[in-house]
């Protein structure tokens, strides 16, 4: 949005600052959207795994401030606000291990890494702090257990996602990646082979259930955890956004574009026929999205801090007479112990 001073002759004596939308329309600063009820999803925002990863990197950055360089392999969590905050603290984010000098401090992200990355880190003499979400670690252990027992492991997930890359690198044998029901029909393996599946933790429950059903139909002998690999926080946020989307005219899902779980929230809101938009922050909001909306729903992906939710509410309050309430939903009280620092 850019601020533009309106011509007094046009506005017949009143004026003030007008705001230009992305499509070129103008809106007066104030209550131009009228009375609007904002409904906040419960739960929303940080999950226990993200909270653990963020607090871990905070602790590491504080401990080694001014004495050793701190690196993080990939984004600690998939959220631009969080990553930029750590950059201001001096944390260096890298995309490959060769960018980390020998003897430095390295933090693994919440998404986990392959066994090869762990071994290379040891060879370089790095001080490693592993902030992998414990629920992702659980999937890693399942893959290792199935592989050791002679199963061909099938991973349901999104190609290129950091969590998927780390999970596929837990064993030396190939792991088959399945992204959709069509991929199930393309699996080349003997029909009587020992098969086991695991899933990425941040998938859509509905889509994953469909894929698992397709796997069981084609391979009746396949074993796996059903939907138990999809983390509790992902399930809770998806259930909440489904319910909330049926109450509102517009849904604002706060999260970065590379956040898998945030994108699933967006998809689910749209599936309920709500107008839905994924935003990194209030700066991405186009007021034209909200014209005619009497109820606006706000949710946030598991990597998005609550401050971003509050900033969106504050921004909407500049342009509407707001009433804010939180929907009924699950209260989360789970915490994960931080990794020990040497």
UniProtKB/Swiss-Prot annotation:
Pathway: Isoprenoid biosynthesis; dimethylallyl diphosphate biosynthesis; dimethylallyl diphosphate from (2E)-4-hydroxy-3-methylbutenyl diphosphate: step 1/1; Isoprenoid biosynthesis; isopentenyl diphosphate biosynthesis via DXP pathway; isopentenyl diphosphate from 1-deoxy-D-xylulose 5-phosphate: step 6/6. Keywords: 4Fe-4S, Iron, Iron-sulfur, Isoprene biosynthesis, Metal-binding, Oxidoreductase. One of its GO terms (molecular function) is 4-hydroxy-3-methylbut-2-enyl diphosphate reductase activity. [4Fe-4S] cluster binds at residues 47, 133, 231. Binds 1 [4Fe-4S] cluster per subunit. Its cofactor is [4Fe-4S] cluster. One of its GO terms (biological process) is terpenoid biosynthetic process. It catalyses: isopentenyl diphosphate + 2 oxidized [2Fe-2S]-[ferredoxin] + H2O = (2E)-4-hydroxy-3-methylbut-2-enyl diphosphate + 2 reduced [2Fe-2S]-[ferredoxin] + 2 H(+); dimethylallyl diphosphate + 2 oxidized [2Fe-2S]-[ferredoxin] + H2O = (2E)-4-hydroxy-3-methylbut-2-enyl diphosphate + 2 reduced [2Fe-2S]-[ferredoxin] + 2 H(+). Dimethylallyl diphosphate binds at residues 78, 111, 161, 259-261, 303. The active site is at 163 (proton donor). Its EC number is 1.17.7.4. Isopentenyl diphosphate binds at residues 78, 111, 161, 259-261, 303. It comes from the Bacteria. (2E)-4-hydroxy-3-methylbut-2-enyl diphosphate binds at residues 78, 111, 161, 201, 259-261, 303. Catalyzes the conversion of 1-hydroxy-2-methyl-2-(E)-butenyl 4-diphosphate (HMBPP) into a mixture of isopentenyl diphosphate (IPP) and dimethylallyl diphosphate (DMAPP). Acts in the terminal step of the DOXP/MEP pathway for isoprenoid precursor biosynthesis. Belongs to the IspH family. This is 4-hydroxy-3-methylbut-2-enyl diphosphate reductase. It comes from Anaplasma marginale (strain Florida). The gene is ispH.
């Amino acid at each position: 949005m850019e601020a533009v001073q309106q011509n007094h002759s046009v506005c017949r004596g009143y004026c003030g600052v007008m705001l230009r939308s992305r499509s070129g329309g103008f809106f007066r600063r104030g209550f131009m959207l009228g009375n609007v009820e904002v409904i906040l999803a419960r739960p929303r925002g940080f999950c226990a795994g993200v909270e653990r990863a963020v607090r871990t990197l905070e602790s590491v950055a504080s401990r080694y401030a001014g004495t050793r360089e701190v690196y993080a392999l990939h984004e600690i969590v998939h959220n631009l606000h969080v990553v930029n905050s750590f950059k201001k603290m001096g944390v260096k984010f890298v995309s490959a291990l060769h960018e980390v000098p020998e003897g430095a401090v390295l933090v693994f992200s919440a998404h986990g890494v392959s066994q090869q990355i762990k071994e290379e880190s040891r060879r370089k003499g790095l001080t490693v702090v592993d902030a992998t979400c414990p629920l992702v670690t659980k999937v890693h252990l399942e893959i290792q257990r199935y592989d050791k027992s002679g199963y061909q492991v099938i991973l349901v997930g999104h190609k290129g996602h950091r969590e998927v890359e780390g999970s596929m690198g837990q064993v030396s044998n190939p792991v088959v990646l399945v992204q959709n029901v069509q991929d199930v029909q393309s699996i080349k393996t003997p029909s009587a082979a020992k098969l086991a599946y695991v899933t990425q933790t941040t998938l859509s429950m509905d889509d994953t259930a469909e894929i698992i059903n397709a796997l069981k139909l084609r391979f009746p002998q396949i074993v796996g955890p059903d939907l138990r690999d999809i983390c509790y926080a992902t399930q809770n946020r998806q259930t909440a956004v489904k319910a909330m989307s049926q109450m509102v005219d517009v849904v604002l899902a706060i999260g970065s574009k590379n956040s898998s779980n945030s994108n699933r929230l967006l998809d689910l809101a749209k599936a309920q026929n709500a107008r839905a938009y994924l935003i990194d922050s209030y700066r991405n909001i186009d007021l034209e999205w909200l014209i005619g909306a009497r109820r606006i729903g706000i949710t946030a992906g598991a990597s998005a801090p609550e401050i971003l939710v509050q900033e969106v509410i504050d921004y909407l309050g500049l342009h509407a007479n707001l009433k804010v309430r939180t929907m009924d939903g699950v209260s989360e009280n789970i915490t994960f112990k931080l990794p020990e620092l040497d």
